[in-house]
């Protein structure tokens, strides 16, 4: 993973203010706009869908707003900036429609207005901007017009994302996710509640043909640590460093962790449920990790082995789940094979990698000739957020597949959708005739979501065949 500051919110993209015609970060806006209804889940429209949107405008002033306003609907896109994977440039494209609308809003009052569009033919991202003249311009929403995917149930889809909500994943045709969960002790008072919530979520995944790689993390174990606190590294004087902390639980909890993993595999493992693989920790680097790993490779091997034992026991009861991880081939060699033996190979079904590009470990004879469960070690990209623009994501996916990846990711979800359940506001307050009411927030979907939909339709589950331009691109 990377520091949150590296990922850029849409309002920080190059050209956002100019293309949208809005001003970011003002202390006061005369009016606000909220999308309160959309005729497509996650604001992703397919060719057969009617495009209908309903907005609520709120007057933030003590004066009436009575104006002939304009609703601008226009197509835009994003493109990459050389040597920068995190900062997109927004560009305006060839469609724009202006809808006149008269708005009359009482002081500190509100009004609802609907917008319908029936002449969009090109795939991509579309912005809806309200222009109220002297009262300013505000973004109403961003939606995408995307290719409709052909979804079928499968165990190992070739494209994956992090969890962005079932609606969004379904609409862009992505059927596999990395899903991080904490280790919750089976003896804790909230374990059954945790299981029930997970059961609801896993059913949602299963019903929508979305497979899951569970990534077990640090859990809720601070109270079990010495002095009941997590542990950062020390400097040469024995003082705590202001850095990441060690969140690894103590060895006496390993058997409970094994029980935890086994119960989840039995409950939610394939084919009974959507879980097709498990791994341990996000980027568990040696020394320190953004995700709180500061134990040594011996400790990792101990915990990983318990996770693998749980999976093997679940397999004996008909569950088909892979076990793997590492997040880079060099880290996997450290964690699993540093003793010079292949003793861990039978419980190393897949390697997860992050940000390795063409440096794909597909030529290791020991991994390719593996005869244990499901054969050779699979190569899964479970992060690599590098193709974060319309013009890059398809190329990144194609390049990764050509490098021998069995699964690609290639993009951070926030560049496609602002509704990540773990990073976004769930509810908003709207005005009604009966007073204020909380409703689910409808989030903006950005142009790169349409590029992902196109990649899924045009690349999808196809096997890599050959490089067309073996001596480099012809231009």
Predicted feature residues:
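Mature N-terminal, pre-catalytic/accessory segment of carbohydrate-active enzymes
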Residues: 1-174, 182
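N-terminal substrate-binding region of glycoside hydrolase catalytic domains
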Residues: 137-263, 275, 279
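Structural preference for beta-strand elements that scaffold enzyme active sites
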Residues: 158-160, 176-178, 209-213, 275-279, ...
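Acidic-and-aromatic substrate-binding clefts and catalytic sites of carbohydrate-active enzymes
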Residues: 160-167, 181-197, 221-224, 285-288, ...
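Sec-exported extracytoplasmic/periplasmic mature domains
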Residues: 170, 182, 206-210, 266-270, ...
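Active-site cleft segment of glycoside hydrolase catalytic domains centered on the general acid/base Glu
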Residues: 227-350, 354-371, 390-398
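Substrate-binding surface in catalytic domains of secreted glycosidases
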Residues: 355-397, 405, 414-423, 438, ...
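Aromatic- and carboxylate-lined catalytic core of secreted/periplasmic carbohydrate-active enzymes
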Residues: 398-475
């Amino acid at each position: 993973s990377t520091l949150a500051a590296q990922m850029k919110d849409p309002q920080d993209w190059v050209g956002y203010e100019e293309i949208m015609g809005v001003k970011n970060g003002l202390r006061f806006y005369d009016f606000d706009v909220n999308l309160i209804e959309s005729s497509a889940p996650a604001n992703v429209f397919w060719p057969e869908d009617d495009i209908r949107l309903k907005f609520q405008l709120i007057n933030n002033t003590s004066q009436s707003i009575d104006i002939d306003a304009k609703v601008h609907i226009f197509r835009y896109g994003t493109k990459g900036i050389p040597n920068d994977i995190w900062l997109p440039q927004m560009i305006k494209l060839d469609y724009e429609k202006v809808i006149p609308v008269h708005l009359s809003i009482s002081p500190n009052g509100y009004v609802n207005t609907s917008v319908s569009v029936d002449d969009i033919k090109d795939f991509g991202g579309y912005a809806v901007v309200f222009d109220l003249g002297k009262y300013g311009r505000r973004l109403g929403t961003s939606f995408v017009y995307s290719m409709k995917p052909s979804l079928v149930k499968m165990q190992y889809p070739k494209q994956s994302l992090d969890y962005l909500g079932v609606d969004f994943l379904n609409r862009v045709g992505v059927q596999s996710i990395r899903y991080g969960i904490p280790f919750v002790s089976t003896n804790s008072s909230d374990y059954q509640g945790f299981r029930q919530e997970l059961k609801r979520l896993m059913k949602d995944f299963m019903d929508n043909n979305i497979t899951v790689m569970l990534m077990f993390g640090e859990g809720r174990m601070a109270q079990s640590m010495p002095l009941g606190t997590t542990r950062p590294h020390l400097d040469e004087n024995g003082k705590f460093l202001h850095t990441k902390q060690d969140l690894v639980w103590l060895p006496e909890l390993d058997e409970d962790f094994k029980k935890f993993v086994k119960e989840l595999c039995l409950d939610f493992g394939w084919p009974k449920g959507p879980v097709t693989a498990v791994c341990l920790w996000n980027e568990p680097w040696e020394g320190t990790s953004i995700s709180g790993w500061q134990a040594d490779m011996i400790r990792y091997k101990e915990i990983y082995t318990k996770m693998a034992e749980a999976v093997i026991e679940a397999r004996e009861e008909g569950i088909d789940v892979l076990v793997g991880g590492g997040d880079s081939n060099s880290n996997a060699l450290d964690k699993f094979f540093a003793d010079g033996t292949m003793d861990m190979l039978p419980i190393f079904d897949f390697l997860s990698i992050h940000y390795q590009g063409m440096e794909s470990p597909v030529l290791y004879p020991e991994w390719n000739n593996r005869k244990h469960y499901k054969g050779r070690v699979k190569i899964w990209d479970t992060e690599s957020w590098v193709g974060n623009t319309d013009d890059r994501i398809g190329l990144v996916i194609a390049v990764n597949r050509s490098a021998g990846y069995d699964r690609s990711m290639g993009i951070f979800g926030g560049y496609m959708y602002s509704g990540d359940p773990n990073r976004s506001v769930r509810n908003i307050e709207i005005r009604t005739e009966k007073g204020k009411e909380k409703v689910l927030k409808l989030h903006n979907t950005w142009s790169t979501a349409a590029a992902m939909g196109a990649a899924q339709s045009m690349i999808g589950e196809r096997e890599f065949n050959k490089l067309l331009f073996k001596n480099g691109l012809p231009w």
